Amino acid sequence: MTRSQKEKMLAGEMYNAADPEIQAELLLTGAWLKRYNDTLGDSAERWNGLLLERLGAVGLGAVIRPPFHCDYGFNIRIGAWVYINYNCVILDVAAVTIGDGTAIGPAVQIYTADHPHDPEQRQAGLQLGRPVSIGRHAWIGGGAIILPGVTIGDHAVIGAGSVVTRDVPAGSTAMGNPARVKAGGRLPKS
């Protein structure tokens, strides 16, 4: 049996992004995002109700401040008491998991979308995704970019503006471009 392009995408395999089923999902998400982003002045309860319509999972007390942008939504799972500030972009062609109590600053970008290195495959419209996982009680500073395939451990801190290209261990602090784990692991207590 031949698998659909959407099934290939969800399995992390190479898929054709121009496939009609995938394009239809993007249109559905675009319409949902318009509704969601039009609620800027509304309550967190209203936001939560809309999030439950499209996201894969939404924990108790989770907040995503509009405007928010994603590819599909159904690949995003956010835990309880997660806070995501304005202008977050999540390219969720693969799973994005955000653990309980995590705080994400404004304009953070989380990418699961990747492309083949072979130019002929790219020209043919082929793509693939690699999942991103952010642990519990992590803090992602504003403007950080998290690249495909990265895992950020529980209680980790990512400095503002950092570009995270590799895994960050639990309890550590990483910053810079590319992000590097700081010696001593944690920011000093103030």
Curated annotation (Swiss-Prot):
Q: Its family? A: Belongs to the transferase hexapeptide repeat family.
Q: Name one GO cellular component term.
A: cytosol
List the Gene Ontology MF annotations in alphabetical order.
acetyltransferase activity; O-acyltransferase activity
- From which domain of life does this come? Bacteria
Q: Which residues form a coiled coil?
A: none
Q: Name one Pfam family in it.
A: Mac
Looking up CDD domains in the UniProt record yields: LbH_MAT_GAT
Q: What is its EC number?
A: 2.3.1.-
Function recorded in the entry: Acetyltransferase implicated in the O-acetylation of Nod factors.
Q: Note the SMART domains from the entry.
A: Mac
PROSITE patterns (alphabetical): HEXAPEP_TRANSFERASES (PS00101)
Keyword list, A-Z: Acyltransferase, Nodulation, Plasmid, Repeat, Transferase
Annotated protein name in UniProt:
Nodulation protein L
